[in-house]
Amino acid sequence: WSERYAAQAEILRYIGHVADRFDLRSLIRFETRVVSATYDDDAGVWTVRTNRGDSFRARFCIMATGCLSVPNTPDIPGLADFGGTVLHTAQWPHQPVDFTGKRVGVVGTGSSGIQAIPVIAETARQLTVFQRTPNFSLPSRNRPLTEQDHAQFEAGFEAYLESLQHSDFGRVPPGAATAPVPPRDVQWQRYEALWQEGGGAILYAFPNILTHHGVNDVACDFVRGKIREAVHDPLTADDLCPTNHPLGVKRICVDSGYFETFNRPDVTLINLRREPIERFTPTGVQTSERMIELDMLVFATSFDAITGALLAMDISGRDGRTLKEAWADGP
């Protein structure tokens, strides 16, 4: 890769390279959606039908639909009435989006929102961020990768692959973790070093950071302290500090200048716990306290996770029982 966190265009080129190298395109039916999968008890096979009218029969039907593939858009009254541009971070246009001089609203401060907000703020006339739940985010420290970086990686490639087989999340911890519970000042020093390193390294600071409340509490205090250092307005800083979940139990986000973005005079944070959205209007958003005029609206509201793609299809198993029936009370 050309940088520590490769951008979309570079990742897309790599995917295209893999598809061409292994002649995968000939095995893929593009612009085709599966609408149903029905199991035949007598024959012991599945019949899969698509929106193009095709049908396929197979002994095995593997649903590789992914956990995060169906975008989630909140059901808020009036969205269809909004006269501006509506985007979702999970369905981004192939063409560049120009926010120059626009009044933009971003709904959501999860992974994609945290990545998009600093970039949008660079050119938007006014950016309003609507946040329900703040999230922990760590600095990415993104940078171009040098020839030395590549040489070091290639020299230890076999050992690196072996270590990945025994790691969680498919990554190698950035150094030996200390056990069991060091003093608070020792924890703080290690967190500071890993904060400067960037990425999700803090999650690997100590082996019990995800299982020991005391260790995790110190980590949370450290990150919240960094947020308050970065954000000048105390109320905004408090609103951006997560307090209802430990560090690491939700997916850790990484960012480039996310918290600092809220120091800009043209960026406003709306805490939806205090000031919920009541409805969208043709010209913007009506909250419980004010009307906010917008030209563009960006939903960074994640996905219908885990089951969304599966329940979107009509899947019937043994005895004609549908997946929706089987999972009526949860999967």
Range-by-range predicted roles:
Residues 1-80, 84, 95-96, 109, ...:
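N-terminal FAD-binding dinucleotide-binding subdomain shared by FAD-dependent oxidases/monooxygenases
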Residues 89-101:
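A short, basic/flexible loop-to-alpha-helix module at the beginning of a structural domain
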Residues 100-110:
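Beta1/beta-strand and adjacent pyrophosphate-binding region of the FAD-binding site
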Residues 116-120:
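Aromatic pocket-lining residues of Rossmann-like dinucleotide-binding sites
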